[in-house]
Amino acid sequence: MPVFHTRTIESILEPVAQQISHLVIMHEEGEVDGKAIPDLTAPVAAVQAAVSNLVRVGKETVQTTEDQILKRDMPPAFIKVENACTKLVQAAQMLQSDPYSVPARDYLIDGSRGILSGTSDLLLTFDEAEVRKIIRVCKGILEYLTVAEVVETMEDLVTYTKNLGPGMTKMAKMIDERQQELTHQEHRVMLVNSMNTVKELLPVLISAMKIFVTTKNSKNQGIEEALKNRNFTVEKMSAEINEIIRVLQLTSWDEDAWASKKDTEAMKRALASIDSKLNQAKGWLRDPTASPGDAGEQAIRQILDEAGKVGELCAGKERREILGTCKMLGQMTDQVADLRARGQGASPVAMQKAQQVSQGLDVLTAKVENAARKLEAMTNSKQSIAKKIDAAQNWLADPNGGPEGEEQIRGALAEARKIAELCDDPKERDDILRSLGEISALTSKLADLRRQGKGDSPEARALAKQVATALQNLQTKTNRAVANSRPAKAAVHLEGKIEQAQRWIDNPTVDDRGVGQAAIRGLVAEGHRLANVMMGPYRQDLLAKCDRVDQLTAQLADLAARGEGESPQARALASQLQDSLKDLKARMQEAMTQEVSDVFSDTTTPIKLLAVAATAPPDAPNREEVFDERAANFENHSGRLGATAEKAAAVGTANKSTVEGIQASVKTARELTPQVVSAARILLRNPGNQAAYEHFETMKNQWIDNVEKMTGLVDEAIDTKSLLDASEEAIKKDLDKCKVAMANIQPQMLVAGATSIARRANRILLVAKREVENSEDPKFREAVKAASDELSKTISPMVMDAKAVAGNISDPGLQKSFLDSGYRILGAVAKVREAFQPQEPDFPPPPPDLEQLRLTDELAPPKPPLPEGEVPPPRPPPPEEKDEEFPEQKAGEVINQPMMMAARQLHDEARKWSSKPGNPAAKVGIGVVAEADAADAVGFPVPSDMEDDYEPELLLMPSSQPVNQPILAAAQSLHREATKWSSKGNDIIAAAKRMALLMAEMSRLVRGGSGTKRALIQCAKDIAKASDEVTRLAKEVAKQCTDKRIRTNLLQVCERIPTISTQLKILSTVKATMLGRTNISDEESEQATEMLVHNAQNLMQSVKETVREAEAASIKIRTDAGFTLRWVRKTPWYQ
């Protein structure tokens, strides 16, 4: 099957596929219509010459290369493409003498398919060899990084730096060239991110090595911390380079592998957090006098939170046990806290409950450890299999290979057996074990032949190829087993989870592999995490909302399982669940915004205080104690920043890339924090040491840069206006605290309150500054900048007034001056917030008072008569709009029920938007802008009520034909998104709807359902044409958008579309060559279909994201833009 993970391969295969598609259509016309096939000797001769040239270049490369794998894999590709070319030549010769020859037509179609497949194989083999060149450079850097461990003198360090630099430069250049060549955006991003991390870590590595050498040679204190810093940096760089090597070898986006890696890291982190909190939690449970809500109880809540995260990453019985235990222990902890709050902490009931919670925490920890161990074992085995199979392939390619290759295969089989033993599905386990037996027998036979010196015989070569294929199949089976051991994955961002949940709520009877319920569980889990840091009634309120959603979800799932998912009771439950989810979402976002406002009000003070403690003079009192305290504060602060950022990613309005950016920055912060503390401790123990100071500054700046990046991403993830509202409310509360402090003569409390106000005001200035930099709208920039300047001028006077009143807190005059300063800050904050308010539309003036109207009994003058002899023509009747009825099922007709149901839904959607009189949609005034603030139609004309947006082509959706359901589901998903908007005056929506309908048609054609090869090829071309239109229009919108962030998002999404649509044309041609053919294996045909399905899903998802981003960009359009799109909701938000 063709792969096109590089632009070069795609650019070569596209014209080949285009020519093949012409031959396929000719074949079909001859086969179906009986048409004579024209003389093809000239074009076939051209193809033969091109193929001969390709094979010649390939053979020359094979003769000169030292790459054994290239030497092994190229000859079969040569044979394949040459045989295909021979068939084409024979077909052309036979058709020249008999244009109606049936065998010639068969040779034509088989030769065409072979040319496309063989060319793809040749190009892929060449590309893999190029990748291996890059990997060799990467592995050279990896090996040289280990040399850092033996560098112990400054001379060695200088030599090491000189040698490492050129290799790094070469690797960076090769990676940059490679990422530009890739067509998968995810792979490009991963390569760029990993390479950037390696570049950023290089000066840190040199700094860490320098401080290690310095402390070791001077025999100063801190050598242990220096060693930790150096080893951490080497390990981090090695991990990133290994990730580069892994991504370089990918030809498709492996979401499961990426998810498994992140899940393993998350489980390990959760387990470490549980272990660190366990003693504190148990101490609180043992002490009946401990206060409810203090650090001990919070430790229990955090343990349950971390265990819950692990439970969410498990499946089946393991998941139920962990989450069930968490819920039970949470309820029991509530009971213990309640008893202690009532002064009954020492009662037998409270003591018993506390002991049960303590024992339960041990049980829960053991369950989490088992889950983490199982996932890690399966993931490690999977990675080990990949490495061993890679080494085994080299052995299989070398006829004279030694016994080590056989050992690699045996090792891979042993790892695969471990995965099989951990499988919950017996069918999956037996399938893997069966493959192990087959591969073991084949390997033994091949090893015997090689021991006899017959490794180069045709039999041995065939066996080597057979073993290589079987190993690849085994790897696929083990990868699938690891993926299936994890639960259905919900989207990483809030809107994605809501959409997945909504799809399931709308149709709970459809099997979505549990994704919809997983999305709801994910939302509820985030709700619990937010509640854990809240106090009193706020926590109970959020927990109650979570429990309500849980309860309704379970009830709806139960009805669906009993086959009553469409019953009136189920529909009522679905409506309640929708409302409860909306309520939960709003409450979670409110709580998260408040937490971000509090935690991110000041991100750098703790690390600055740590720097002050680390540079304290040697004779400073309590120097060590102060440092330890500030180091602990810094670590706690960093942990809070990370936890809050994760909540913002999960509950905010961020897109997938922002969420992943937050997760990456949080991970980096967690890794860097202990390294910063180690660097600070080295400086503390080596006062005046310049190398120690420079190293600490390097680590500190890296931490600050990462946190600034995290802060920016968090700000992107939440609504700016909501953050400003929350900050304004927090400043009001701080002012109230200051009033209390002045009334109670508490200067320290006053200073704390004033400091908090200043920090929050500065945070607002930072947010405003970022938004000004992000916008190109001059009016908005001027308004925000003016309000920010005014706020900036109020901060210093307030701080000065606070200092004055703290020095003489009883002075009423000073108190009044301070409060006036505080209120001035509040007023300035309000003006900043108002600058972010969307402009209200200018409403028409109200009608005049009826009493002022002058009404008389005088009749209006008669109309002038028509010119003599003319008769007015009768008014023609309005064109009758037909609502075609959906075809009913005939008696005895066997239909595809899911397909019929999907088509009925689309038909009903079409009828909703009919403007036919009497239709309920027409009565509510479809076409009127639904949003009260008119945000969705800024700058666009409001359509008339009578405007018709009916689309009869929706009824062309297939009804009873066999279809490919995944492609249809992708088309429906895009169609649902597009039908939220009227297509009148909006070419993007019109093109998106066309694409959805065309893709639904393709879903019928790919299985050969009453369609033709020509129809399939033409359908793909039409989809590509509509794709180009969507891309062109999206780029026009991006050009006029004043919001840089939204513009970038839109361009990133829409630029994926042309590549995917080109691939769709090629894959459709491949599939067309297989339709109606009996000499194609089921496996080959299914593989072609799977690739087509995956491509269709990617295309529909990219267009859907483009529609959303284009709508967001249209709100921020230039006022002088000549290019406009009209965004009018068809379904008002209030319905």
Curated annotation (Swiss-Prot):
Region of interest called N-terminal globular head, as start-end residue ranges on this chain: 2-836
Spans annotated as Talin-interaction: 168-208
Residue stretches of biased makeup (Pro residues): 861-877
Positions of modified residues (N6-acetyllysine): 173, 497
Free-text description of this protein's post-translational modifications in UniProt: Phosphorylated; on serines, threonines and tyrosines. Phosphorylation on Tyr-1134 in activated platelets affects head-tail interactions and cell spreading but has no effect on actin binding nor on localization to focal adhesion plaques.
Family recorded in the similarity comment: Belongs to the vinculin/alpha-catenin family.
Name of the protein in its database record: Vinculin
Organism: Sus scrofa
